[in-house]
Amino acid sequence: NGIRVNAIAPGYFRTEMNSDYFDTEHGQTYVRSKVPMGRLGQLDELDGPLLLLASEAGSFMTGTIINVDGGHVNNSL
C-alpha cells in the first residue's frame, strides 16, 4: 500500500559517453531530424519532472511515464 510506480523517459541528452558523436555534423543533423525541438536536452531539464514524481505534488500519480524528449516520441508516431 502506498507504493507508486512512475518513470521518466529521457530523450537525447549529452553525456560523456555520447558527446563526441553529438559534436559531429552527422550527430547534429540526426538530432535536428528526430527531435522537433531541434536540440539535445539539458540535464537540468529533468529536475522538474523528477521533483514532481518525488514530491507530494505527484501523490496521486502512478503508472505514469513522463517523456522528457523534446517531442521525439510524438515525432516518431
What spans do the regions from the language model cover?
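A conserved structural motif in NAD(P)-dependent oxidoreductases
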Residues: V35-L46, A57
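Short, flexible catalytic-loop segment of classical short-chain dehydrogenase/reductase
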Residues: A9-D20
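Rossmann-like NAD(H)/NADP(H) cofactor-binding core
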Residues: N1, N6, T64
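Catalytic "switch" loops of ABC-type ATPases
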Residues: R14, E56-A57
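A short C-terminal helix-loop "cap" of Rossmann-like NAD(P)-dependent dehydrogenase/epimerase domains
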Residues: Y21-V35
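Residue-level preference for short helical/loop micro-motifs built around acidic side chains
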Residues: S19-D20, T29, D44, F60
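Short C-terminal tail/terminal secondary-structure segment
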Residues: L51, T62-L77
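Alpha-helical segments that scaffold the active site and NAD(P)H-binding pocket
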Residues: P10, L51-S55
